[in-house]
Amino acid sequence: MKTHVKALVVGGGAVGTGIAYHLAKAGWDTMLLERDELTSGSTWHAAGLLPLFNMGYATTHIHKYSVDFYKSLEAETGLNAGFYVVGNLRMAQTDARMDEYMLYSSVAETADVYHEFMTPKQIRDRWPLVRTDDLKGAIFHPQDGYINPADVTQAMAKGARQHGVTIERKWQVDGYKWTGSEWIVSITKMVERGGNLLPSDETAEIHAEHVVTATGNHAQRTARLLGIKIPAIPVEHQYIVTEPDPMLQEYRKNHPEHPVLRDADAKWYVREERGGWILGPYERNAPARFLYDVPESFRADLFPLDLERIETEYLSMIHRLPSSETTGLKDDFNGPICYTPDGNPLVGPAPGLRNMWLAEGFSFGITAAGGTGYYLAQMMVEGEAEMDMASLDPKRYGTWMTTEYAARKNEECYAHVFILHHPDEEREACRPLRTSPAYDRQKARGAQFGQINGWDRPNYYGPVDAPAEFDHNSRSFRRGSWWKYAVEEAKAIRETAGLIDATAFTKHIVRGPGATAFLDWFTCNALPKVGRINLTYALTPTGTTRTEYTIVRNGENEYYLVSAGAWTAYDADYLRKCAEDKAPEFGYIEIHDVTTQWGVFAIAGPNSRKILAELIRDANPETALSNKRFPWLSARKIELGMCPVNAIRVAYTGELGWELHHPIEMQNYLFDQLIAAGDKHGMKLVGGRAQNWLRQEKSYRAFGTELGRDATPLEAALDRFVDLSKDFQGKQAMLDKGIRSLCCTLLIDGPADADPWGKEALLLDGVKIGRLTSGGYSVAFNKQIGMGYVRPDLAKVGTKLKVRMFRELYDVVVVEDGPFDPTNARIRVDG
């Protein structure tokens, strides 16, 4: 057995073999270890469905690659991958479900995923066994279907071997040790004894520069060995196989196989299986399993079937396929399928570790295996994937995440597979968990909360006496009933003042003798002078945008960094690793995460100075907030009543405003003072949805939408924040990329009852030329607004395009950056 490799992949399911294949194809010396046999985990009992349907941009690309890749495997390896291209039909019982499919259609169009819409009559004419009288329609993917999980895994394994991969079975990993340049992986030979797989006395060590874990149901053991948290915990998934259906058998004499049928409103999928049907429900109350480890006795095993739990779904299958009523039950499966709290797998660098890569938590592992291997190999070999993989990054979960949280959220995620996935969806499990001190005060004033990175923060403020189900019932693919409240909040910031809770912001202190030199290299903008702030970006080594920072310079070698609240662990990990790498060159650097030490209120609007003037304690309170003493883009320590505040004159809404960073234990006092003063000046409490609209009126980019690892700051049209006179990480790579596409702001004459969500395709003469990354409503222009990426030649002011919403085309025009108050007069106003 080899003992030294470039990359070691741990786990021989579909995901692990897909990764090994693509690493070897990219030229890396790769070994794959499997503790049992290939496919012996969840792969063996997977139903093998290959749904192209997914609302996520990155995941859609992963699924699309897999489907195309699997079709090519036989030609390369000589092994039939068992791919049945029967298509996939997603039916809709409600208008809301059809709205969901139309929004998905926009995502699919941006990724070039072919699909069709069908009427109930078209469905019935083509597949007469399907009852359609209560359907509104369907969306059909003719190019996907299902695959034999064992066959496709073996085909990928053969392809991997052809590219030089060594596959070793019956070896269990027992330890990982990082030497500073490689991993030493301790392994033990597993042997069969009495039907169980047990460790033997034979051990070995593998030296690997890189390690990828794709350990499926064993992710908690992997987490323990690595000393990290991995929120990948399996949930029971049942499916049943019926006896042959005589009417189906008769139909098949003259017709091809049915597509995979999905009745999302009934929470199930069905496909043909040897003259009968497979029913796979996603029912409520499916329990999480293996919260801490998989028992040694559990191999290719299953759990007892719980028919009572899926009775509703079974009866609804009979309703949709009446011929199935007389068929008996032939077989059943109830096995563990891994989930994560948000349903996306964990793909990318492990938190806090070097050259350790995770590929865990796949609930649709067969669908994702090929694409994950392709894009993860790009990340490992080239430094970044060709698209932004941040939505799958393991560090989207921080150290606050516990096993109990992951288990409960994973159960919820399983039960939500087929619910309506509104863009304004907020799930209720494990909430509230992380809250700012003012949570109860905000709730008493009508706050309806959303959860980001475990934090509950206001999305908008509804009626004070709203029932518990108000927010859930407000959701829509069009303008939900929350929309009017967000409009009033946005108007308040433009006309009077608004107060936003931004406590969830990520906050770091960077200081020490090497801090200035490090941050000058780490970010692309010039560093601010003491007492001033700037907006800047940390780049990846490949020149794309990794993190957006507001930097406050507290002293010659002390800086306060503020970044997006959703990405605390993601930002901290990169910041620390880069600082560790550069400390020998630049000198000692301290990094402190102070996120939970400081609360933040953002006050903005024409009356914001008047409100703060009532509270400020200063020898000359009339001038304390003037442009002379407190200019735009500066920071000062002030006192608001009895609360010390680190105030920053900046506003994400494009109005006169300040961020008020305060000791978190004084938040309720400060909140009460601001409310009392603000009530005299028309101030409203404002949530994140109104803020999102307002920042688009100013063309302020947001991380995760306009900003990410698939575009450079220059492509994001942020040239003014890039100092090309200095050296910084990723500079040359950024310049070498050129301008492949360009970010711009667009005003949209859209439908009367809907706004774009930032998922829609942009077209010129019927040809896709870009996509929206953000969307919403503009109170300033009284129409829809959006931001997105287009071909560089089309990013000019006045360019007319089209956007597709609800299968209709609407007029779009490219406008100047910051179309509202383009000279920033309102932000700079004196007083």
Regions from the PLM with identified roles:
Residues 149, 265, 274, 296-433:
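C-terminal catalytic lobe of FAD-dependent flavoproteins
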Residues 47-52, 88-90, 227-253, 312, ...:
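Central beta-strand plus flanking loop segment that forms part of the substrate or channel wall
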Residues 72, 93-169, 174-189, 193, ...:
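Flavin (FAD/FMN) cofactor-binding and adjacent substrate-gating region
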Residues 2-15, 31:
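Beta1/beta-strand and adjacent pyrophosphate-binding region of the FAD-binding site
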Residues 387-388, 393-831:
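Glycine/proline-enriched, intrinsically flexible loops and inter-domain linkers
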Residues 24-44:
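Glycine-rich FAD pyrophosphate-binding loop
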Residues 48-126, 265-270, 275-278, 411-425, ...:
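Dinucleotide-binding Rossmann-like beta1-alpha1 core, especially the glycine-rich loop
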Residues 18, 176-303, 312-315, 320, ...:
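Flavin-dependent oxidoreductases
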